[in-house]
């Protein structure tokens, strides 16, 4: 099973590169980075926070009636992925233009979609505030956004057959005497 966290983060980065700026990169938390091109968008994270209200200790059973089988596993844990977004530009005017693109992105995209599911995209702290980092001539603005309820499954999976064997016994209606036993699995 592919990583759901990886899929949703890759989908977010690709969408930001297409809609905001092609100079969008993902950097891990507590990593020192160097801005190589402006304008740029640094996506710092994700920082995971579990959604404990959705925690469930029961087993999840999925039945495949066509194949007469079942799959039993624990319910997934749901995590919120928090990202810090840092916009960087050469001038204040270019930063304001980039801020507008970033804000419009989050207004236009309320969810991030992968091949299997879609996840809500929530604004925690809007992008804003002009800052001058490290006494350089670059301008920066930052904000925080969240992707909610990303599923993470454990690897404890039990698969089995619903029906272990099937025998059909054909009997004479009047005497109840066995005429034939039919085994479709053989």
Model-derived features: where do they sit?
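Catalytic micro-motifs at enzyme active sites that drive phosphoryl/nucleotidyl and oxygen chemistry
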Residues: 30-32, 70-75, 127-135
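Small/polar-rich, solvent-exposed N-terminal microdomains that initiate assembly or binding
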Residues: 1-63
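Residues at beta-strand starts and edge strands
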Residues: 37-39, 77-83, 139-141
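Active-site-adjacent structural patch at catalytic or cofactor/ligand-binding sites
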Residues: 47, 57-87
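Acidic-leaning, charged glycine-interspersed low-complexity segments
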Residues: 18, 96-99, 103-162, 170-172
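Non-catalytic surface loops within mature trypsin-like serine protease
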Residues: 47, 91, 147-151
